Amino acid sequence: IQAEKQKLIKAGKIKKEKPLPAITDDEKPFEIPETWKWVYVDDICINLQYGTSKKSSTNGKMPVLRMNNIQNGRIIYDNLVYSSDDEDISKYSLNTDDLLFNRTNSKELVGKVAIYKSDMPAIFAGYLVRITPMIISGDYLNYVMQTKYYWNYCQYVRSDAISQSNINAQKLKRFKVPLPPLAEQKRIVAKLEEILPLCDKLK
């Protein structure tokens, strides 16, 4: 992981930052197989980027995804707003398998996440944070961030104001992810994508 990050730092793709302390045995949330390891979100992502703060409109060149477009781990293209700002379009255009994290919302919904699959070109708004996965399947990370374990973390670290709650990027970086080998991540994703539609039909 660290070797891969060093390559990206040398290439100028990410900035060098002080690494988080190693996860001790006492800090591990639960038992995982020997071939897996505990990592922080910060260890497995290229960067965490806040979205545009510029005003959007009902018409424009490109959709601006907002927190209402994140539902059940997927992007929903309803009630879209748009931007024609070329600088923002260049800076905030989403790439396949980027994850969007909702940093500000009600206390029940703050922290919700969805994966972007290039259904249509889009950028993202300021209440969202882009997570760019590295050495991890974006789909696997997205499924981890739909679990009760993840939601318990969000409820624990959120900061509450009068009408909304917030989880900043520093708290997101410290979320601990159970990381299997990449081939196993892909098998887990394939199995979930096989059985979850069946579960939905039973509801």
Q: Where do the PLM segments sit?
A:
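A short glycine-rich beta-alpha junction/loop motif
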Residues: 121-129, 139, 159-179
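Non-catalytic DNA-recognition/assembly elements of restriction-modification systems
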Residues: 22-50, 182-190, 195-203
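Short coil/turn segments at secondary-structure boundaries
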Residues: 17-23, 54-61, 156-158
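Short, ligand-facing micro-motifs at secondary-structure edges
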Residues: 70-82, 99-124, 139-143, 151-158, ...
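Interdomain signal-transducing alpha-helices
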Residues: 131, 141, 145, 185-188
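Sequence-specific dsDNA recognition surfaces
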Residues: 23-27, 42-54, 68-98
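Extended, domain-scale alpha-helical bundle/helix-rich regions
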Residues: 1-20
